A protein has these predicted regions:
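Core SAM-dependent methyltransferase catalytic element
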Residues: 176-197
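Conserved Class I S-adenosyl-L-methionine
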Residues: 141-165
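Class I SAM-dependent methyltransferase Rossmann-like catalytic core
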Residues: 1-25
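A short, conserved alpha-helix within the catalytic core of class I
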Residues: 106-118
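A short acidic, Gly/Pro-enriched loop at the edge of an enzyme's catalytic core
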Residues: 89-97
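Conserved glycine-rich SAM-binding loop
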Residues: 36
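Class I SAM-dependent methyltransferase SAM/SAH-binding core
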Residues: 31, 39-87
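Conserved beta-strand signature within the Rossmann-like core of class I S-adenosyl-L-methionine
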Residues: 125-137
Length: 197
C-alpha cells in the first residue's frame, strides 16, 4: 500500500520548522493534533531532537502515519495515539501543541473543542502553534485564499478559512495569549499562543 502524500505538507515545511524550533526551544514534549499523513512529523522530529514528538489523529489515519514513521524513523518520534476532538484527549499535561491545516477543515464546534483541549492539557507557559490560512477583519489575504475558501465550503459547508479575531477570542477565553503571528509563504500564517499563568 502506498503511503498517503499531501503536497500541502511539503509546502513551507522549512519555514514552519524555523518558527517551531524557536517557539519550542524550551519544550520537551509536543503533541501534534491531526498528524494527517505523518509527513510533518517525520520532518520536524529529527530536526528538533530535544523534543519528544507525539503524533495523533483519528483512527482512520493511523495506518498512513505509521507507514511514514516506519520509513523515516526517529528516536524521538512516537507512534500515533487516537485523538478525536469530539472526545476527551488521551493524554495528561504536555509542554507544546502543534496543528497544521486543520482549523479550516473541521467544524467551528470542533475548533472550539480544540482550544478547550489545548487549555486543559498544555502546561503553564506552554506554547501552541497553529499553521494555516486566516482572514483578517473578515477579509481574505489573497485571491487564492478566497478561491480556496469557496472550494472548502463546496466540499463541506462546515469548513471555512477562519477569522483571526474569532480565533484570538476563543484562545483568550481559555487562557491563551497570542504571542506571535508569523507570515508564512503562500498566504499562510503560523500563530503562536502561550498558556498564561
Amino acid at each position: 500500500m502506498n503511503k498517503p502524500f499531501s503536497q500541502a505538507c511539503e509546502n513551507n515545511k522549512v519555514a514552519i520548522l524555523a518558527a517551531l524550533a524557536d517557539s519550542f526551544s524550551a519544550s520537551k514534549t509536543v503533541l501534534e493534533v491531526g498528524s494527517g499523513s505523518g509527513q510533518h512529523a517525520v520532518f520536524f522530529a529529527p530536526n528538533m531532537p530535544w523534543l519528544s514528538w507525539q503524533t495523533s489523529d483519528i483512527l482512520a489515519n493511523h495506518q498512513g502515519i505509521s507507514q511514514w514513521l516506519k520509513e523515516y524513523p526517529a528516536g524521538n518520534l512516537l507512534h500515533p495515539i487516537e485523538l478525536d476532538l469530539n472526545h476527551p484527549w488521551p493524554i495528561e499535561k504536555i509542554d507544546a501543541i502543534y496543528t497544521a491545516n486543520t482549523l479550516h477543515i473541521i467544524s467551528w464546534p470542533l475548533v472550539q473543542a480544540f482550544f478547550s483541549g489545548v487549555s486543559q492539557h498544555l502546561n503553564q507557559q506552554g506554547k501552541c502553534c497553529v499553521y494555516g490560512p486566516f482572514n483578517y477583519q473578515g477579509q481574505y489575504t489573497s485571491e487564492s485564499n478566497a478561491g480556496f475558501d469557496i472550494w472548502l465550503k463546496e466540499r463541506d459547508s462546515q469548513s471555512a478559512i477562519r477569522n483571526i479575531e474569532a480565533i484570538m477570542a476563543l484562545a483568550e477565553n481559555v487562557g491563551l495569549s497570542l504571542e506571535n503571528d508569523h507570515a508564512m509563504p503562500a498566504n499562510n500564517r503560523l500563530l503562536v499562543f502561550q498558556k498564561l499563568g
